[in-house]
Amino acid sequence: MKKYFLILASFMLVACSSSEQNLTYSTKPILNITSSLSPLIQVETTQKSAVIKNKSQQLLNISYHLYWYDHLGVTQIWENQQESYSAQFLLKPQEQKSIDLTKPTVESKNYRLYLK
């Protein structure tokens, strides 16, 4: 009886295991855009840059925060002891801008870009 219980328990554990990759090990950049800005811009990201294009006919004031993470998902700290780099810029109608995504540490593997 014990033997059957152990076999059944083993099958249940195998069935419950997941082969999906954990998000902390993802190498795909994370992009967050506020709902009011999202329909007005187009964004393309790579590991080294992000290109933001103003699709609207109005001048946009865009602020962003850039967070970098190591291979375990731990936030990397910038030289000034901040967890993110922040900046803002203006985009004229139909204009596009490229943001260079400088890594704060050699351990930095993936980033999250938050646009608002």
Curated annotation (Swiss-Prot):
- Return the InterPro entries for the record: DUF1425, YcfL-like_sf
Per UniProt, the keywords (alphabetical) are: Signal
Pfam families from the xrefs? DUF1425
Specify the signal sequence span.
Answer: 1-15
Q: Which superkingdom?
A: Bacteria
PROSITE patterns per record: PROKAR_LIPOPROTEIN (PS51257)
Q: What are the leading ranks of the lineage?
A: Bacteria, Pseudomonadati, Pseudomonadota, Gammaproteobacteria, Pasteurellales
Can you say what this protein is called? Uncharacterized protein HI_0960
Origin species, per record, is: Haemophilus influenzae (strain ATCC 51907 / DSM 11121 / KW20 / Rd)
